[in-house]
């Protein structure tokens, strides 16, 4: 997959979330795709990922992606590393944070996505021991 095709596929994936379009979402994924969320939870295959997509948007979560902006996009024919800014509303609360995804491609679709969320600076200092003299 060339850079243009990879970027187009990632843009379709993120737009499917902001537009709440499950058919477009599923069209970006391989039949046995794996999505690993920032919290470590995962879904596999079109049936499970479709149910996850639907449940995230439905009550009681009521999820709504308000923005998903790609800041940096690096790729080769098999994979991509992406930095992004994400905004959403869940359970009636708004959230926004930077993050990154590692994406593997197979036959023109997404085979796997592993998402990472950047921690707030205070949490990073505690986890790394920085700032604790």
Question: What are these language model-derived features?
Answer:
Residues 98-130:
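Short beta-strand edge/turn micro-motifs at domain boundaries
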Residues 61-62, 88-96:
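Short, cysteine-centered beta-strand-loop-beta hairpins and adjacent loop/turn segments enriched
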Residues 67-74, 86, 98-104:
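Hydrophobic/aromatic beta-strand elements that line small-molecule binding cavities or substrate pockets
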Residues 3-4, 22-26, 30-76:
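A solvent-exposed, acidic/Ser-Thr-rich amphipathic alpha-helical stretch
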Residues 29, 86-88, 101, 117:
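Short beta-strand segments enriched in hydrophobic/aromatic residues
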Residues 34, 54, 83-89:
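Generic short beta-strand segments
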Residues 77-79, 107:
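Residue-level signal for tight coil/turn positions that link beta-strands
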Residues 1-31, 124-133:
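Short, low-complexity N-terminal intrinsically disordered segments enriched in polar/charged residues
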């Amino acid at each position: 997959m060339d850079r243009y095709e990879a970027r187009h596929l990632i843009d379709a994936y993120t737009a499917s979330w902001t537009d709440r379009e499950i058919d477009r979402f599923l069209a970006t994924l391989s039949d046995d795709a794996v999505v690993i969320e920032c919290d470590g939870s995962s879904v596999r295959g079109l049936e499970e990922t479709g149910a996850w997509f639907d449940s995230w948007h439905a009550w009681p979560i009521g999820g709504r992606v308000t923005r998903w902006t790609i800041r940096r996009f690096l790729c080769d024919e098999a994979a991509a590393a992406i930095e992004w800014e994400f905004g959403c509303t869940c359970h009636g609360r708004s959230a926004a944070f930077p993050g990154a995804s590692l994406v593997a491609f197979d036959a023109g679709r997404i085979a796997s996505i592993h998402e990472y969320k950047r921690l707030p600076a205070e949490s990073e200092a505690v986890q790394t021991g920085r700032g604790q003299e």
